[in-house]
């Protein structure tokens, strides 16, 4: 999926898979500069850090997006056992025997992108935007570019509609993602008003879970090397 940084695209409507975290909020901010209509969709799957739903609602209002839908998909909680769906399972820094982190929720992005695709179909939108990333790989197979391409193909063939899944962060590291927020003058908003923490702490988070470690490492790198990281981001933009 090609990253896009132009001020406008040919597609006037986009659906953003929006959790209220750093990555999806950064994608939402960028989308507002590129599309005439930006529709957010947030999923309630009984997640451990379900405070993110209220954060997403607040940010959607603050950023004045076209519409924001919160969808109940708590059935996923019944089917997928994970540290993110069971409070009794502590978030671990170690990988499980199958090589995946215990925060992996099987089928989550398959379900999210399928439902976002149906929503985009009804809205007449031609793009779904999601903040998945392969560069700072967290071990989630459903964040890989190959998976996204496969999902896009399935949606196009299954609904007989031209639909793009756009992944602006796919090849950016976390420092470059912070730079992207700063590029749109929204670094402070993303830093202090998003929720990435698996333990549900807004802003800089608990400081202990894997999500907080990755977020902090990227922020520290960006703040210490702003010019260099911004130059890397600019170099990654597609040339006209």
Swiss-Prot record:
Cofactor note: Binds 1 zinc ion per subunit.
Disulfide-linked positions: none
CDD domains (UniProt xref): QueC-like (cd01995)
InterPro entries in UniProt: QueC (IPR018317), Rossmann-like_a/b/a_fold (IPR014729)
Positions that bind ATP: 18-28
Recorded metabolic or biological pathway in which this protein acts: Purine metabolism; 7-cyano-7-deazaguanine biosynthesis
Cofactor(s) the record lists: Zn(2+)
Transmembrane feature ranges: none
Reaction(s) the record says it catalyses: 7-carboxy-7-deazaguanine + NH4(+) + ATP = 7-cyano-7-deazaguanine + ADP + phosphate + H2O + H(+)
A Pfam family recorded for this sequence: QueC
MF annotations from Gene Ontology: ATP binding; ligase activity, forming carbon-nitrogen bonds; zinc ion binding
Entry EC number(s): 6.3.4.20
Recorded family membership: Belongs to the QueC family.
Name of the protein in question: 7-cyano-7-deazaguanine synthase
Source organism per UniProt: Shewanella sp. (strain W3-18-1)
């Amino acid at each position: 999926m090609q990253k896009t940084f132009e001020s406008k695209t040919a597609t006037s409507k986009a659906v953003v898979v929006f959790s209220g975290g750093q990555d999806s909020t950064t994608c939402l901010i960028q989308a507002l500069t590129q599309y005439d209509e930006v529709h957010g969709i947030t999923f309630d799957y009984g997640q451990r850090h379900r405070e993110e739903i209220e954060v997403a609602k607040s940010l959607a209002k603050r950023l004045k997006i076209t519409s924001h839908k919160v969808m109940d998909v708590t059935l996923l909680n019944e089917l997928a056992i994970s540290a993110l769906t069971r409070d009794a399972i502590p978030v671990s820094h170690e990988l499980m025997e199958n090589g995946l982190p215990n925060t992996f929720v099987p089928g989550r992005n398959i379900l999210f992108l399928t439902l976002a695709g149906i929503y985009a179909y009804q809205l007449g939108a031609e793009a779904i935007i999601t903040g998945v990333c392969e560069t700072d790989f967290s071990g989630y197979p459903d964040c890989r570019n190959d998976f996204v391409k496969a999902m896009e193909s399935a949606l196009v063939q299954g609904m007989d509609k031209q639909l793009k899944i756009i992944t602006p962060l796919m090849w950016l590291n976390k420092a470059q993602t912070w730079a992207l927020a700063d590029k749109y003058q929204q670094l402070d908003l993303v830093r202090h008003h998003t929720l990435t923490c698996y333990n549900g702490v807004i802003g800089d988070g608990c400081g202990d879970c894997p999500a907080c470690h990755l977020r902090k490492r990227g922020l520290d790198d960006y703040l210490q090397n702003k010019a260099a990281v911004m130059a890397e981001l600019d170099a990654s933009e597609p040339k006209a």
